[in-house]
Amino acid sequence: MDRPEDRRLETRSSANVRGLIVTPGLELPCLIVDQSNSGVRLRLDRNLALPNRILLIDIAQATAVEAEVAWRKGQEAGVKRTGAASSLRGLVPSRLAAARAALIRAGGR
């Protein structure tokens, strides 16, 4: 049986790393399944509604990136990066203070 044509403009690489979605009033663990330069596919523990804009933390890399939710299907979501990744190590700008605190609570450094 033929596989459906992949219409992505960029190739995705497998990641399988722990992530954390942070929005005002929400910290949601997730798995970063795969990623490209412009987007990330996430797997969530629960089927919760997400706001359009999120802050996605890569726990292993201790980085955060602003993103927009592009699609949702069950417990998976695709997000489009809307900014560059910022380090959460050391001093961080005030806009990332909540993300740094969430990273520490999740066991990141």
Regions found by a protein language model. Give the residues of each.
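Structured alpha-helical
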Residues: 1-109
